[in-house]
Amino acid sequence: MGYILGIDTSNYKTSIAVIDHKKHIICDLRRFLTVKQGERGLRQSDALFQHIQNLPELMEEMRRMFDGRIDAVACSFRPRPEAGSYMPVFLAGSGFAKAAAAAMNVPVVGFSHQEGHMEAIRAYSPFQTEDRFLACHFSGGTCEVLDVSETDLRKDGMPKQYFERSSGADDNGASAKKQGADNNGASAKKAKKPHPADPAERVAYTMHITGGTKDISFGQVLDRTGVALGMEFPAGGQLDLMAQKFCEAEQAEDPGEIFKGVSRDMLQAAKEACRLTPVKVKDGWLNLSGLDTQARSRIDRLGLEQKQLQTYALAADLFAKTSKAASDMIIQCSEHSGRASVLLAGGVASSKFLRSHMRKELNGRGITAVFGDEMLSQDNAVGIAL
């Protein structure tokens, strides 16, 4: 049986995973990078340093859980599967992967972080038999609707030698021209032709961007709002819980059972005070800087802090506007492509609030939304290993 070690080093997490040839997850380890209170992310140099610290520790932990033979090592080389896509954080994982592969005398292969996100959901979904499909990548720095096609590598399956001992491992350093990018690859209007810059790198998918953001991402809006409220970065998960709780109170017969001492009138007043303007979507494209400005102006104007009722109301409306905008974007791209199903990946797509509301919105338009496992939507090394 062949076992593959996967390594991913994003702007948010250090991740290591082991899978077998039947796609069973043997080991899945992740560690958030530490961000100082009040800051909205890390500089690349700081993130790179933390990855260098985390990787040996996670490798030791992996070996305590799995002592079998590793037959190949896979890693993320770059944010997106295209020439010019580059971020220093991925040098930590690719360098560590090459060293580990050389030490174990096994092959090493690299993909893009975005391909890892896609494969982590696709491999365990109905899309695993589709060679072309519509997908969304919603994460901390990416907001894209993609027309995805398999390359010959995916159609033919992984080369047999990935599961055989080799005479050595490739040790050439990855290189690519730097581009101005948000966390893990900002949106661009057109996909460039995939062009691996490293002999160990492979391209599993070609991705053409058919919709998305023209400025910032959903993840950035959520994180900036959360940090402005005094939350730790990344803040999307905490805001998601708050949004769900407010909706639960709205649906409860007595809101006071959810928020002690709160009446329905108080709930409605909080909702009205924090109401945000909907995001306009045209031809599958949108701008999110306005939503970001609105949310933070509400925080300043109302003097909001964590745990206040109005803060929960703001979280709920922010997620509601995000859900509607994302759904509208998908609907427009679906109409243009003629595809009635969409795969959703990325950390933002792990939100329970978004999953519930978007399924309802999209199903009403005859579109099937495939989200997959919540944990596999977030940054992970499983997709890279697959």
Role assignments for model-derived ranges:
Residues 241-342, 351-367:
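A contiguous, well-structured pocket-lining segment that forms one wall/lid of small-molecule binding clefts
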Residues 1-2, 106-134:
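Conserved phosphate-binding catalytic cores of ATP/NTP-utilizing and phosphoryl-transfer enzymes
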Residues 60-97:
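Short beta-strand-loop/turn "lid" adjacent to the catalytic site in phosphate-handling enzymes
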Residues 150-162, 198-251, 298-300:
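Glycine-rich phosphate-binding loop plus the immediately following alpha-helix
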Residues 10-49, 154, 204-209:
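Short glycine-rich, Thr/Ser-proximal phosphate-binding strand/loop in the N-terminal lobe
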Residues 75-78, 100, 139, 343-351:
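Glycine-rich beta-strand-to-loop/alpha-helix junction loops that act as flexible
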Residues 2-24, 132-148:
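Gly/Thr-rich phosphate-binding beta-strand-loop-beta motif of the actin/hexokinase/Hsp70
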Residues 117-120, 372-386:
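Glycine-rich phosphate-binding/hydrolytic loop that grips phosphoryl groups
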